[in-house]
Amino acid sequence: MFTDYVRILAKAGKGGNGCISFCREAFRPHGGPDGGDGGKGGDVILEVNPQLSDLSHFLFSPHQFAEDGQPGKGQKRKGRDGKNLKLEVPPGVVVYQLDPNRIFHSSRDLLPIPKPGEPLKKIGELIEPGMRFILCKGGKGGRGNFQFRSPINQSPRYCEEGEEGQSGQFLLELKTIADVGFVGLPNSGKSTLLRQVTDAKPKTAPYPFTTLKPHVGIVNFDDGYRMSCADIPGLIEGAHQGKGLGFYFLRHIERSHLLVYVLDLADPFLDPVQVFYTLRNELEKYNKELLKKPFLIVGNKVDLVAADSLNHKSLDFNKRTGLSFLPISALKAQGIELFLNSCRKSFESTKKLIPSSPKVLSPLT
């Protein structure tokens, strides 16, 4: 099952306690303190693995605990540090923290998943392969009694306990990274278009809501240029209110630099102009920033439309919107070369460089 939204409870390891010990060797029956420090608790770390495509591996393991540090030992020996817990996530994950003022200790402390629209505290974002984010930092090890010796107290009989590791409950939200995002009504031919132009193989069928999860494919041009495209489940009017399936996946086109509106020209009951404005309206209700993205419009299924009808639809669309659509047939591969060249030209002229990010982000404070 495709999963792009999960809740986890993470807890870093506790630092090991310091040791109370005194040197007892031959010829030194009353040696001084030699208790070692405790080891540091393990961190909980998120790391991007480009081979992963969703977050389903967290569904049955929402509780993630790093190893505790070991206590110190005599002869000034430091306890072993706890092992870090590395959690792999796909590129494009956004990390939110729930109730940062609360300390979590067990699964009984789990909070309910917030409803869509509730404000969340964003603490990190993982985009590039290999990027790491310290979700919870392990506690420091306690000092052994050797650290407390002084001229006044040469035989301290006390030590420090290790610090508790950081803990928290987090939401991981996947936003697919794709250069181009396809938007359209159910059964408009988005999946067929994706199959035609990329290496992706989404399911296609002559009924609505065939696409139940986002699909990403790569367009390979003859000169070696590559461009990624994403197809999400179709939108319907009222999608911003939770109707249909598309609303839950609109996050997957937020990072796209170019949007492609796919219109079905073959359906006699659909007005292409009205469909276009419906799609724009749903994007605006979800996130106004999506309307600022550059876009192309394609009129699909022209193989099922008579030439005079296609010409009329094209002129009418231009007259009422001031815009034009590219006529294509995703099924018959008509107009695909022009479509891809237009996508590439628009993408190259409008894409923004993603700022470089450090490989390891700062831990929670």
Curated annotation (Swiss-Prot):
Pfam families: GTP1_OBG, MMR_HSR1
Record-listed E.C. numbers: 3.6.5.-
InterPro entries: G_OBG, GTP-bd, GTP-bd_Obg/CgtA, GTP1-OBG_CS, GTP1_OBG_dom, GTP1_OBG_dom_sf, OBG_GTPase, P-loop_NTPase
Obg domain span: 1-177
Binding site for GTP: 184-191, 209-213, 231-234, 300-303, 329-331
Gene Ontology CC terms, in alphabetical order: cytoplasm
Biological process, per Gene Ontology: ribosome biogenesis
Protein name stated in the entry: GTPase Obg
Gene that specifies this protein: obg
